Curated annotation (Swiss-Prot):
Pathway participation: One-carbon metabolism; tetrahydrofolate interconversion; Amino-acid biosynthesis; glycine biosynthesis; glycine from L-serine: step 1/1
Needed cofactors: pyridoxal 5'-phosphate
Subcellular location: Cytoplasm
Superkingdom to which the source organism belongs: Bacteria
Protein name, UniProt field: Serine hydroxymethyltransferase 2
GN (gene name): glyA2
Residues at the site labelled Plays an important role in substrate specificity: H229
Family: Belongs to the SHMT family.
Function of the molecule: Catalyzes the reversible interconversion of serine and glycine with tetrahydrofolate (THF) serving as the one-carbon carrier. This reaction serves as the major source of one-carbon groups required for the biosynthesis of purines, thymidylate, methionine, and other important biomolecules. Also exhibits THF-independent aldolase activity toward beta-hydroxyamino acids, producing glycine and aldehydes, via a retro-aldol mechanism.
UniProt keyword annotations, A-Z: Amino-acid biosynthesis, Cytoplasm, One-carbon metabolism, Pyridoxal phosphate, Transferase
Major enzyme class: transferase
PROSITE patterns to which the protein is assigned, alphabetical: SHMT (PS00096)
Gene Ontology CC entries for this record: cytosol
Location of N6-(pyridoxal phosphate)lysine modifications: K230
Species: Pseudomonas fluorescens (strain ATCC BAA-477 / NRRL B-23932 / Pf-5)
Length: 417
């Protein structure tokens, strides 16, 4: 028998030490990885609840196990809130991750060997949009579009040319490192021209979409996926959305269960329900606007300091800094910033001469720093510190000076009070 007083402390101190160290790192470091954020304690409470114990294969009202009457209510809440948040007619909250959701969309709507047209990983796309190392690039005939390297913008004429040439069964619109607004009507027009399905992966901008600060793809796409973390600020998980279409809905449900997954993670679905409720609150829009304001302020500092920002700026929560002109690598810059307790990620940029393990760029995002309370003033100052380190890459004195300022700023803006 277990006791409600059981704790990790005193039982598994090695594990507890690692957990505590990570939580302290989150407090002491400035987080600028675009895909990371901090969840509320409410989300954590739901995810750490007794729902962890319940197996519930199937869907609400159609389970393969008994005792699901309460978890049915949990999943129904998550579904209805997701539909309300994004104006969707259909929502599946069971995908374990964004990548799982994408794979399940392909499983539902494609056959092995079908052609898909997605954004190149090297130009800002995602692994699951047809990269050769991904199952999406192994199971399907993946054709890749990219950006115009002169402007940093998606070349929609090139997308259309490729679509006409290759006749894809599905066009994938979405990104992991693109700072401008996607033209969903143009994607829909191209898809209709060649008779393709349009699939939108809005994982990075879902929070902005929910707040009405980024175009909603639902009116244009046949199916939409997202993660529930990143800008949505919920637990790590996936979500599939669609307009009313009984045939597609049945295929999507069957692809998730039993096609790709067994029992859903009910504790995570509960945390998703909390996240969606938080995103429906009036203050969520103000948060998302601040995310954009902070990103634009930071990008402006880099431009003023002589660094190339891909696409010339940002419309959302992230931007890419190219270090090609400075002759620096993303790997070295990432490491130097880490020593100053600033966490970013190295990232490939257009025309990158370096390997994906080295790169010539940095991806910077503002969801996490905005959650801890940073405004434009703090983000402008922070961008200046990053430029100082890049201007004097490898200078231990500069890194130490920035680290001291980072420590003071983190103390003023704790993640959890």
């Amino acid at each position: 028998m277990f006791s409600k007083q059981d704790q990790i402390q005193g039982y598994d101190d090695a594990l507890l030490a690692a957990i505590n160290a990570e939580e302290q790192r989150q407090e002491d470091h400035i987080e600028l990885i675009a895909s990371e954020n901090y969840t509320s304690k409410r989300v954590m409470q739901a995810q750490g609840s007794g729902l962890t114990n319940k197996y519930a294969e199937g869907y609400p009202g159609k389970r393969y196990y008994g005792g699901c009457e309460h978890v049915d209510k949990v999943e129904a809440l998550a579904i209805e809130r997701a539909k309300q948040l994004f104006g969707a007619d259909y929502a599946n909250v069971q995908p374990h991750s964004g990548s799982s959701a994408n794979s399940e969309v392909y499983l539902a709507l494609l056959q092995a060997g079908d052609t898909i047209l997605g954004m190149s990983l090297a130009h800002g796309g995602h692994l699951t949009h047809g990269a050769k190392v991904s199952s999406s690039g192994k199971l399907y005939n993946a054709v890749q579009y990219g950006i115009d390297t002169r402007t940093g913008l998606i070349d929609y004429d090139e997308v259309e040319r490729l679509a006409v040439e290759h006749k894809p069964k599905m066009i994938v619109a979405g990104f992991s490192a693109y700072s401008k607004t996607l033209d969903f009507p143009r994607f829909r027009q191209i898809a209709d021209k060649v008779g393709a399905l349009l699939f939108v992966d809005m994982a990075h901008v879902a929070g902005l979409v929910a707040a009405g600060l980024y175009p909603n793809p639902l009116p244009y796409a046949d199916v939409v996926t997202t993660t529930t973390h990143k800008t949505l600020r919920g637990p790590r998980g996936g979500l599939i959305l669609a307009k009313a279409n009984e045939e597609i809905e049945k295929k999507l449900n069957a692809a998730v269960f039993p096609g790709a997954q067994g029992g859903p993670l009910m504790h995570v679905i509960a945390a998703k329900a909390v996240c969606f409720k938080e995103a429906l609150e009036p203050g969520f829009k103000a948060y998302q606007q601040q995310v954009i304001d902070n990103a634009q302020a930071m990008a402006g500092v880099f431009i003023k300091r002589g660094y190339d920002v891909v696409s010339g700026g940002t419309d959302n929560h992230l931007f890419l800094v190219s270090l090609i002109r400075q002759g620096l690598t993303g790997k070295d810059a990432d490491a130097a910033l880490g020593r100053a307790h600033i966490t970013v990620n190295k990232n490939a940029v257009p025309n990158d001469p370096q390997s994906p393990f080295v790169t010539s760029g940095l991806r910077i995002g503002t969801p996490a720093v905005t959650t801890r309370g940073f405004k434009v003033t703090q983000c402008t100052e922070l961008a200046g510190w990053i430029c100082d380190i890049l201007d004097h890459l490898g200078d231990a004195d500069v890194e130490a000076n920035v680290a001291r300022q980072v420590a003071a700023l983190c103390a003023d803006f704790p993640v959890y009070r």
